[in-house]
Amino acid sequence: MQVSVETTQGLERRLTITVPAENVENEVKKRLQQLSKTQRIDGFRAGKVPASVINKRFGPAVRQEVAGEVMQRNFYEAIVSEKINPAGAPTFAPKALEAGKDLEFSATFEVYPEVEVQGLDKITVEKPAVTVTDEDLANMLETLRKQHADWAEVDTAAGENDRVTVDFVGTIDGEVFEGGKAEDFPLELGQGRMIPGFEDNIVGKKAGEEAIADVTFPDDYHAENLKGKAAQFTITVKKVEAQELPELSEEFATKFGVTEGGVDALKVEVKKNMTRELDQAVKANVKDQAIKGLLANNEIEVPKALVDQEVDALRQQAAQRFGGDAQNMPELPAELFHEQAVTRVKTGLLLGEVIKANEIKVDDAKVEALIATVASAYEDPTEVVEYYKANDQLMQQMRNVAMEEQAVEAILAKATVTDVETAFDDIMNPQQGA
């Protein structure tokens, strides 16, 4: 076998491989002989079909099949001998498939980039210094009360946080537009569900009264034909309802599985959950900063094959999030996921090099701690831990997470990390402060 390697562009490589004719011919001959023993052809007894007839009928297909296998086998032998690490599957192109001649073919593929992580000491991370305060706990209990509130119809004017039932008709230049009309539409005021300006004149109206809302659809509105358009909505208020919040009581506590200790026990349980979620959010925030710093200080080229694989994975995840099956849904454009896919591939390659450079081995204690953290959110943590340990796939996922966390810790050890006083809501609900 003769092998030559050339760099075509970027990470793309082309191997040109020549396989001696006898390697191909011997295998073709062997398979044709096997076929002659099993094929039934009119005019010949079973097992007595002449080689020339078998060759004429099956020779080209057998040669194609053998050539494919020979190319695969010799390609992998070549990359081992040449110490090449391909990223993705190769594309084979045989020069010719002529009997009695050497098989010459090319294999085009991408390789992994050579990565040398640098600039870790230039990374700066602001670690949120935050705890769950009494005010945070009170706000969370209020949120839980609102989530379990009842609604009672009232004769008063609609106010912020009230719920109204309305009919509305929207027009643009005096014409009703598609999707601009609804009847018996429930709307909780103050939640920001509608476009800016829609709710403003509903506040202060009673059932039976009418409001006019002059609005402009945002430039990034989902309906292409409405982006940036000025519209007017005529809104009829049909019903106004006010929230009736449940009292913080022993009965209320039982809604959350707290059967003993009443409100005090509920507060302890809620604060424990808030603290666990806060710890996870802080860790995610710090990790995100570390990864962004890693990417900013290390520009690397990524194999298109890996990006394409990541795009497919993201596309499938998107289909699952929308409750669909990726097989049966219209294919979402690759452009939607390309930027995220590139970032994920770069991150994976760089973290892999951090792991390699620091000779990081998976920490079993960290794996145990990760499983325990997941399990603590469930009613029976012991059962969840046992479930994980009995599932090889889940355990491997946890080992991967642990390795990634260890890599991030290695980055943070060289980065400049500063504690910054932060409010609970700024970490848990960052979009509200945006």
Curated annotation (Swiss-Prot):
PPIase FKBP-type domain segment(s): 161-246
Reactions it catalyzes: [protein]-peptidylproline (omega=180) = [protein]-peptidylproline (omega=0)
Location in the cell: Cytoplasm
An annotated GO cellular component: cytoplasm
Record-listed E.C. numbers: 5.2.1.8
InterPro entries: PPIase_dom_sf, PPIase_FKBP_dom, Trig_fac, Trigger_fac_C, Trigger_fac_C_sf, Trigger_fac_ribosome-bd_bac, Trigger_fac_ribosome-bd_sf, Trigger_fact/SurA_dom_sf
UniProt keyword terms in alphabetical order: Cell cycle, Cell division, Chaperone, Cytoplasm, Isomerase, Rotamase
A single BP term in Gene Ontology: protein transport
GO MF, any single term: ribosome binding
Domain of life: Bacteria
Keyword DNA damage: no
PANTHER family (UniProt xref): TRIGGER FACTOR CHAPERONE AND PEPTIDYL-PROLYL CIS/TRANS ISOMERASE, TRIGGER FACTOR-LIKE PROTEIN TIG, CHLOROPLASTIC
Family: Belongs to the FKBP-type PPIase family. Tig subfamily.
Function: Involved in protein export. Acts as a chaperone by maintaining the newly synthesized protein in an open conformation. Functions as a peptidyl-prolyl cis-trans isomerase.
Domain comment (free text): Consists of 3 domains; the N-terminus binds the ribosome, the middle domain has PPIase activity, while the C-terminus has intrinsic chaperone activity on its own.
Protein name as it appears in the record: Trigger factor
The organism of origin for this protein: Pseudoalteromonas translucida (strain TAC 125)
Gene this protein is translated from: tig
